[in-house]
Amino acid sequence: MDIHHKIEGLTANAVSAAHQADLEVQARFGVRFVRYWYDEKSGKVFCLSEAPNREAVEAVHRHSHGLLADEVVEVAEGVQ
């Protein structure tokens, strides 16, 4: 999951457009963006993705819209 802490002027339309831009280039980097959450008031955005590593996630954001995450948290899925 990557976290953008403060995107100035964040709107639902803007985050949707940025997510769409990610989807258009994600395959080039072996990434699959799953979903995102945002809070317009604070400017925070959380992006859930499946990727081989953090560098691949950063590359997608860099090439699609330039809004690099402030944090990338690498996690493994638990078994139920």
Question: What would you call each of these model-derived segments?
Answer:
Residues 1-28, 32-34, 39-43, 55, ...:
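Short S/T/G/P-rich N-terminal loop/turn motif that feeds into the first structured element of a domain
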Residues 5, 48-50:
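Short hydrophobic/aromatic beta-strand micro-patches
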Residues 28, 64-67:
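Short, well-ordered coil/turn elements that cap or connect secondary structure elements
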Residues 52-54, 65:
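Short, surface-exposed beta-strand-loop junctions and turns on beta-sheet-rich folds
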Residues 66-78:
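Conserved short beta-strand edge segments in small beta-sheet-based binding/regulatory domains
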